[in-house]
A protein has these predicted regions:
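Ligand-binding loop in jelly-roll beta-barrel domains
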Residues: 89-116
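Short acidic-glycine-tyrosine-enriched beta hairpin
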Residues: 72-91
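Residue-level marker of beta-strand positions
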Residues: 47, 58, 83-84
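A short, N-terminal "cap"/entry segment at the start of jelly-roll beta-barrel domains
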Residues: 1-34, 115-127
Length: 127
């Protein structure tokens, strides 16, 4: 059984930071559960261009608000506490209007140290 807390992750290699965001990777590929699970926080005012080409992602909003724009269609979605979104490999931009706290699941699971590449994606996992 895996039992872990956010405090266990803080300031370890599973506590990953980027420009305006932070992800505490509670479950990763090496845990062997078939998905990864992170608590992700994004700063107010952050604008991120994302495109998860190699992963499926689902995010549940705990706190905060943002707008997600589907870059291929221009469709804008407003999200807040209780919202879930799953981009399905869509290119999207997230604009955070109040500090955002999310629970994010990725499949295939993240290894734990990923950061976004120039296209806003994570590279595929290698064995």
């Amino acid at each position: 059984m895996i039992v872990r807390t956010l405090d266990d992750i803080t300031d370890t290699e599973r506590d990953v930071r980027g420009d305006g965001w932070r992800a505490k990777r509670l479950l990763v590929r090496d845990d062997g559960v078939g998905f990864s699970l992170s608590e992700t926080t994004v700063d107010r005012g952050a604008k991120m261009h994302l495109w998860y080409k190699h992963h499926n992602e689902a995010c549940f909003v705990i706190d905060g608000e943002a707008e997600i724009t589907e870059r291929d269609t221009g469709t804008v979605h407003r999200i807040g506490p209780g919202s879930v979104y799953s981009p399905e490999h869509d290119r999207h931009t997230i604009r955070v209007t109040s500090p955002l706290r999310l629970v994010c699941v990725f499949n295939p699971p993240l290894t734990g140290r990923e950061t976004h590449d120039a296209e806003g994606s994570y590279l595929p996992a290698t064995d």
